[in-house]
Amino acid sequence: MGFDSVKVMENWQSKTSNENEKKKKKRRRKKNNNVRNSEHYEEEANGCWVKFRYIVCCASSTSDVETSLTLSTSTVGSQSAIVQSNDQPVGPVSSTTTTSNAESSLSTPIISEELNIYSHLKKFSFIDLKLATRNFRPESLLGEGGFGCVFKGWVEENGTAPVKPGTGLTVAVKTLNPDGLQGHKEWLAEINYLGNLLHPNLVKLVGYCIEDDQRLLVYEFMPRGSLENHLFRRSLPLPWSIRMKIALGAAKGLSFLHEEALKPVIYRDFKTSNILLDGEYNAKLSDFGLAKDAPDEGKTHVSTRVMGTYGYAAPEYVMTGHLTSKSDVYSFGVVLLEMLTGRRSMDKNRPNGEHNLVEWARPHLLDKRRFYRLLDPRLEGHFSVKGAQKVTQLAAQCLSRDSKIRPKMSEVVEVLKPLPHLKDMASASYYFQTMQAERLKAGSGSGSGRGFGSRNGQPVFRTLSSPHGQAGSSPYRHQIPSPKPKGATT
């Protein structure tokens, strides 16, 4: 073999060796890519676990959550600014409605600068809360809200570790739905307000969890759920004395926020679904995601985007965006009216002219001869006549169109204090017989029965529903019967 032939052979062997080496590298790269793809798939699968949970538990959250949308101040003054129905957020027609979550996601929050850590709050790990709620299983689901799903769980009384169901401390774990209508900003507000504000009529925040994109809040468990459930979902009505006890407790909670807290707070989202009840029907305010600091001394109001629930928001706040403590007083008046009548603040299932509770009730509030037409027919006379008169007068003051005329919440508390203990039941008086006769006469004359009818001689309470076919959402949906009115039988 000549020199040239040897050189060609060496070149061919070198080329073959290089090609083989390239093939080996290509195979190694392909193998590594497969490994990375497998790892990525596993990460996706793990990440989807939480998403799957939200899909299972919160599939209907878009339609029936009770949350708060924002109203652009450019639409203030427009009479058509609000067209939403009961328990639907205040929002504009002509401008773009954005969620508070959008506001929260505009920039990545710096947790260390925004989150105020309070020594009495417990920091839970996500895995502990996952185990405490039994893997967020559907049987532990208490309900849904704008923030996300709420689950029942059990943890150590003096720690954060999960314990066997029925032992330790019973808690309600609220999870942040990444696709929900409330976001990180509201999560922070909950911690920063409830972590600092301690009062018997505010729900107790036990702790929180923040890991990666997980945001959870842990509250004391409220066994009797929300006032909304008892007013609009139960087969048995709340007795009059219990209604007055709840009204007094809720008033004390607002009074504390407005007049007793070191830094006064405007609640901004007072409604029946945010009033939770413990085992003794003590009222506790929950959901501080929309709360705002009251105006500084020397200022009359806080200017802010309009946020809240339609039917509860004060008219001057909706029109101007000027927020004061008297805005909360108006909302309290709406809830007081709901407790008095057994009707929702907004209900399009009612006859024309009765959709808006406040507007329907105004003519009756200050008329001593007509106020009884407001009373929940399911009470069947088991209410205090003097108490009912006081409540209607108080509701009228709270619902005054002039915010300056509305009372302070401390004044509301003083009016309500004696009402749970009054014993002058209407059913035991001649007054009640006259009232019933007038009511039946008015009902037969109008054809609508003022929103109530009878079946087998007994009053029938109309079943209410939201525009989406449900009666509105609440963070608690327990099947706990309401107490019976005195003298009632099953």
Curated annotation (Swiss-Prot):
The keyword Transferase applies. This is Serine/threonine-protein kinase PBL35. Belongs to the protein kinase superfamily. Ser/Thr protein kinase family. It is found in: Cell membrane. The active site is at D269 (proton acceptor). The modification Phosphoserine is found at S273, S303. Transmembrane segments: none annotated.
